[in-house]
């Protein structure tokens, strides 16, 4: 591709590269970094002005030396060179880069010769952790090879500051918002805690581009970021985290901006969304013209074929005939392998490499099989199927995933949870595990077991939501001190609360102590952010022609003369701009859009987008810290719907809590039987230290 003209900003867009995914696998271990290298070579060969990466560059927040080496090598080969970077930075980068020393863009550093700058945000996989709250993107920023922007310092008070660029007559405002837990971000937007700083707007002078990394669709009422929460001055939103590639712009008619969902560059789960063709995108922006987007297919993607069948739909199969079922499934897999190999040959022939490859790359194959009992008979017997691992091992050496070619699952039946299960209602029986296993599509995660166990237990001290998240950090992100730190923090908080309760200090009754502890636990689980009293925002032009921001009858001026703040209104979820009539600018000019129109219906009450307290309810606030499974990180994925359904059931079960009783009620209840437990003994000893 030729060089862009002096007034065109050319951007390569990518997201969810997941370098390091499954890197110990002898067949697919190098797929992620090879594709990332291809992406960056496309940026170099197409003479782009910058690369924008919308999260999850690495698959884990502690990447291996191999993954880190491959990324550093690729960035050095593709981003450094003699070609000058023609972008002029107009804003103060120290407001965006939250570092002590490296507060400038890397291409303006005299110690580096950067030809293609990379701007990236952190995702949910490579997020910050540890005492210093550092993530892999911080390390790359310190090396000078990446510009890490969009960091979130406080999740309940977020200020989104753009980087302002100019090339010729074209001006670009680049916004970034790193990954925040979806429920928490939903609550922050709802409470008016998100502030956008916007450049001076004149007749569409600025092209406003934003990168986010959140759920795009609702797994629960609050576990996603609605497009309606984003301000309407944006022109385009790059949506990371979702792995399905949608190779066209989708227009939001309510907010009047376009949404691009690039998808992942490597298949991290064997599901339908990952089976779609994968692209990177080149965006050309020129002042006065509609943006031009060009999708470029990725060539290093391993061929992936997926098929779903139901044994009920095969008339000649009988539930008890295991051999006939296995024979039929083998035929289906053989057909999928033939189709995948033909597609790989065609791809190599188009690239001119058909005769140079000694062996075809092995494809990824996934056959999902519903083995539920036939619905047209009274027999409750399910189809007899072979062990999935043994069945899959037939194809070792011919497919890339020789251990999980087939996935057996049953249709979900209505779930009725018993209050008592096993001993004291806190244990999970083999039948419970089997039910969870079948509901999750044959692949069970530790997170699902922990969530189900906590729903059946009646913890009197630790909040289940926080404990669930601590276990996830311990298992998924190898944070060995996550559980210890969480328990120590919660005990310290609750002991501090109880030490100020005079009635608790006076009583020695164990039952009364337990009742008071439950109240403290409920209060500790729900920490709502108080809504701001006045979020109304007004804009006016001052004497210098620059915007100023007024909120709550106070005038607040920003530090940069080119940027003005914009608050997200707590009532309507949009940015209100009311300007003086004497200098009222015209609205954003209508661009000729080539985007696919998608009619977005008005959100009903069931989606809980409105900020009315009676619609959201206390239960949603109480469960704002529920962590939703990231289906895109599963080595062999289940359906997102299956995973979210199990968590949603847990959520509904958990929200049925009794209202907090008063201390007087607790006192009367404590006059009955009395029994001491190790938990109350521990609290008693801690409180004794407090008394001293």
Swiss-Prot record:
InterPro entries: Calcineurin-like_PHP_ApaH, Metallo-depent_PP-like, Mre11, Mre11_capping_dom, Mre11_DNA-bd, Mre11_N. The active site is at residue 125. Residues 575-586 have a biased composition (Polar residues). Changing residue 76 to K: Does not affect ability to mediate DNA repair. GO terms for cellular component: chromosome, telomeric region; mitochondrion; Mre11 complex; nucleoplasm; nucleus; site of double-strand break. Its main location: nucleus. Residues 612-629 have a biased composition (Acidic residues). Keywords: Chromosome, DNA damage, DNA repair, Endonuclease, Exonuclease, Hydrolase, Manganese, Meiosis, Metal-binding, Nuclease, Nucleus, Telomere. Its EC number is 3.1.-.-. It is an enzyme of class 3 (hydrolase). It is found in: Nucleus; Chromosome, Telomere; Chromosome. It comes from the Eukaryota. One of its GO terms (biological process) is ascospore formation. GO terms for molecular function: 3'-5' exonuclease activity; 3'-5'-DNA exonuclease activity; DNA endonuclease activity; double-stranded telomeric DNA binding; endonuclease activity; G-quadruplex DNA binding; manganese ion binding; molecular adaptor activity. CDD domains: MPP_Mre11_N. Its cofactor is Mn(2+). Mn(2+) 2 binds at residues 56, 124, 213, 241. Residues 522-597, 610-629, 644-692 are annotated as: Disordered. Mn(2+) 1 binds at residues 16, 18, 56, 243. Core component of the MRN complex, which plays a central role in double-strand break (DSB) repair, DNA recombination, maintenance of telomere integrity and meiosis. The MRN complex is involved in the repair of DNA double-strand breaks (DSBs) via homologous recombination (HR), an error-free mechanism which primarily occurs during S and G2 phases. The complex (1) mediates the end resection of damaged DNA, which generates proper single-stranded DNA, a key initial steps in HR, and is (2) required for the recruitment of other repair factors and efficient activation of ATM and ATR upon DNA damage. Component of the MRN complex composed of two heterodimers RAD50 and MRE11 associated with a single XRS2. The MRN complexes dimerize on DNA to form joined MRN-MRN oligomers required for DNA double-strand break repair. Belongs to the MRE11/RAD32 family. Present with 432 molecules/cell in log phase SD medium. This is Double-strand break repair protein MRE11. It comes from Saccharomyces cerevisiae (strain ATCC 204508 / S288c).
